[in-house]
């Protein structure tokens, strides 16, 4: 059956206002994806048959300094050992198993090993609080919990008394000090001995045959910006559909070396990692997120998925070096960036061939200046860099493309098993500011209220133990309501903001805070920012400065300070930051521009409840914590 697309556009005039709803769907169905009995339980073993002793995983031990590796055959053997050990512990099909750890190879073995016995894995963020893990363990009735390092073990151990179903804690890191009075905890190495020599492999293989695509693979609890915790159910059918769709849209190959640094508890990294495994790529497992740039320089990945904040840091770092360079060097680099922008964005992104003279000039800069920048990042030989999770500033997106890195901007949710849409860099024209074209086999509808709604094989069937919220999350046509406002133009999806985050000023103007925040986060002096505007006369902001740079600026300009509070209250500092804000917000409408701001001495944190585990702002909590500072900005 041929593959084809259908756009259905509905429009009518209502009191002089044009209203439209757009739908996109790729109608082709792949029989292998829809009907096969193979699911994630056998993925690694199939790849081992294909790739054998080729390198599959590159990693460091917990606290280790040296990079090590596993071949595909070794990877497969470890997964089988986990499956056998789980059977010896008494794990049943579709039983829920928790994984509370930072990224590690043990984490990957545990995921695939659990799927091998048709169990369900529930990833917890390594930064989760005791209250959060207690809720998830009790909600999902978890008996067995894998944990990473000392922090995770200590939290799990203290939670035991409040979790009646929890029987066993399995500790990945051998350096963790297990409480001598804790009979429930064992090290991962001890656990693996339960599956040594694969004593129950016949039963494991029988479970492979019984597996079906309706089996749950994961339950991912999303705390969200409101604080409500919901377990998103993801099946093997969703994963198979997602792998097929992303295979068509995102071209990672067996030649790629892929850095994993976002948490495996994040659906973006989890989905991306499984795609890379399914394509035969080599994974580089980064355990400590703070070490990612060091890891990149040591291992030279060709691809990785990232959130916009990563590229914002790269952008501000390069801009700082440009600002500190000589006049001649500064002029040269800015000209090179202008050439890169013209070549890669004005021509290539629009599907046009650059003029020969421009191409030759770009090639010169690409092999000199831009290659030096990429080398500093450890990105000498590169493929693609999927980026999602928040709004990407146009400045940052243009910069990344200009220096010769293929940023693939996309959009997705946990409920859609990551990708809904993404750029097709090098294949189809893409627009800076869009989140790309819808992926294969997903239907997008823009509701009358402007909400992005989804239907397709990658969409969750609902929330674990929450039929009430599940029912509220789908419309009468069976479309999942994302909560994001957006529109489709020329086949590309554009997002505005979270519907619940859209502010309406007291003058009746609508403000999209994430868009404004993304514009300002490119400034090197701004580390965090929250826009305030709802039912207010004008837009204001709470800003956490990048204090290391701000302190350097103060010393260079003779500004006396004893601590951060002095910097926050200094008039010269305020004047400097306001001037930088005014430069960045020139293209915003007058009513969108920040009129006042307050500098805060301490960052927004997960521990304070101001950030989610994915580092998104909990605006309600921040508004409550800084009510006094906010009211002061609006005082006459």
Spell out what each predicted region is:
Residues 18, 240-257, 264-370, 381:
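Conserved AMP-binding/adenylation subdomain of ANL enzymes
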Residues 44, 88-89, 116-194, 576-582:
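Structural core segment of the AMP-binding/adenylate-forming
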Residues 52-55, 170-171, 192-221, 228, ...:
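Conserved pre-ATP/AMP-binding loop-to-beta segment of ANL
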Residues 57-112, 129-134, 187-196, 234-237:
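Conserved AMP-binding/adenylate-forming core of the ANL superfamily
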Residues 69-72, 217-243:
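Conserved AMP-binding A3 loop
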Residues 76-81, 213, 232-253, 261, ...:
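Conserved structural elements of the adenylate-forming
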Residues 84, 128-159, 242-259, 289-303, ...:
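Conserved ATP-dependent adenylate/AMP-binding module captured primarily in the ANL superfamily
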Residues 438-505, 522:
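Conserved ATP-binding/catalytic segment of the ANL
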């Amino acid at each position: 059956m041929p593959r084809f697309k259908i756009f259905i556009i509905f429009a009518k005039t209502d009191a002089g206002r044009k209203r439209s709803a757009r739908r996109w769907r790729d109608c082709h169905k792949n029989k292998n994806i829809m009907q096969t009995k193979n699911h994630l339980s056998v993925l690694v073993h199939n790849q081992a048959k294909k790739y054998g002793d080729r390198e599959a995983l590159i990693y460091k031990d917990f606290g280790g300094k040296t990079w090590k590796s596993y071949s595909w055959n070794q990877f497969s053997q470890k997964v089988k050992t986990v499956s056998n050990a789980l059977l010896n512990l008494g794990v049943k099909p579709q039983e829920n198993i928790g994984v509370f750890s930072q990224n590690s190879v043990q984490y990957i073995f545990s995921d695939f090993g659990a799927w091998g016995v048709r169990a369900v894995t529930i990833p917890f963020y390594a930064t989760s609080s005791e209250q959060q893990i207690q809720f998830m363990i009790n909600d999902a009735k978890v008996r067995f919990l894998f944990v990473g390092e000392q922090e995770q073990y200590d939290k799990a151990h203290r939670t035991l008394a409040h979790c009646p179903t929890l029987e066993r804690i399995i500790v990945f890191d051998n350096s963790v000090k297990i409480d001598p009075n804790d009979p429930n905890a064992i090290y991962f190495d001890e656990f693996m001995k339960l599956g040594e020599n694969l004593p129950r492999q016949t039963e494991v293989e029988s479970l492979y045959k019984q597996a079906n695509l309706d089996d749950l693979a994961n339950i991912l609890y999303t705390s969200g910006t409101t604080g409500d915790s919901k377990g998103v159910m993801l099946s093997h059918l969703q994963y198979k559909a997602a792998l097929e769709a992303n295979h068509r849209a995102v071209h990672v190959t067996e030649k790629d070396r892929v850095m994993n640094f976002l948490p495996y508890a994040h659906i973006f990294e989890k989905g991306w990692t499984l795609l890379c495994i399914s394509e035969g790529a080599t994974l580089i497992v980064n355990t400590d997120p703070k070490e990612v740039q060091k890891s990149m320089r040591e291992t030279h990945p060709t691809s990785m998925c990232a959130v916009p904040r990563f590229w914002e840091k790269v952008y501000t770092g390069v801009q700082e070096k440009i600002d500190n360079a000589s006049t001649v060097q500064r002029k040269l680099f800015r000209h090179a960036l202008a050439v890169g922008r013209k070549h890669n964005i004005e021509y290539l992104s629009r599907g046009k061939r650059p003029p020969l003279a421009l191409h030759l000039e770009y090639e010169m800069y690409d092999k000199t200046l831009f290659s030096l920048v990429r080398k500093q990042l450890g990105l000498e030989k590169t493929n693609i860099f999927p980026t999602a999770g928040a709004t990407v500033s146009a400045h940052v997106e243009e910069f990344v493309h200009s220096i010769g890195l293929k940023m693939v901007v996309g959009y997705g949710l946990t409920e859609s098993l990551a990708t809904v849409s993404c750029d097709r860099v090098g294949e189809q024209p893409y627009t800076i500011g869009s989140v790309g074209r819808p992926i294969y086999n997903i239907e997008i509808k823009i509701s009358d209220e402007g909400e992005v709604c989804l239907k397709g094989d990658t969409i969750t069937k609902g929330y674990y133990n929450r039929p009430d919220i599940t029912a509220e999350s789908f419309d009468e046509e069976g479309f999942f309501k994302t909560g994001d406002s957006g529109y489709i133009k020329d086949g590309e999806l554009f997002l505005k903001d979270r519907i619940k985050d859209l502010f309406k000023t007291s003058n009746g103007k609508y403000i999209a805070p994430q868009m404004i925040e993304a514009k300002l986060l490119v400034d090197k002096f701004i580390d965090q920012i929250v826009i305030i505007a709802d039912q207010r006369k004008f837009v204001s902001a709470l800003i956490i400065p990048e204090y290391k740079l701000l302190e350097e600026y103060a010393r260079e300009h003779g500004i006396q300070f004893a601590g951060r509070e002095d910097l926050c209250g200094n008039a010269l500092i305020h004047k400097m930051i306001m001037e930088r804000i005014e430069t960045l917000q020139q293209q915003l409408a007058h009513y969108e521009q920040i009129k006042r701001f307050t500098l805060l001495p301490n960052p927004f944190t997960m521990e304070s409840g101001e950030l989610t585990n994915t580092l998104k702002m909990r605006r309600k909590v921040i508004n409550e914590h800084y009510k006094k500072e906010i009211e002061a900005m609006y005082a006459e």
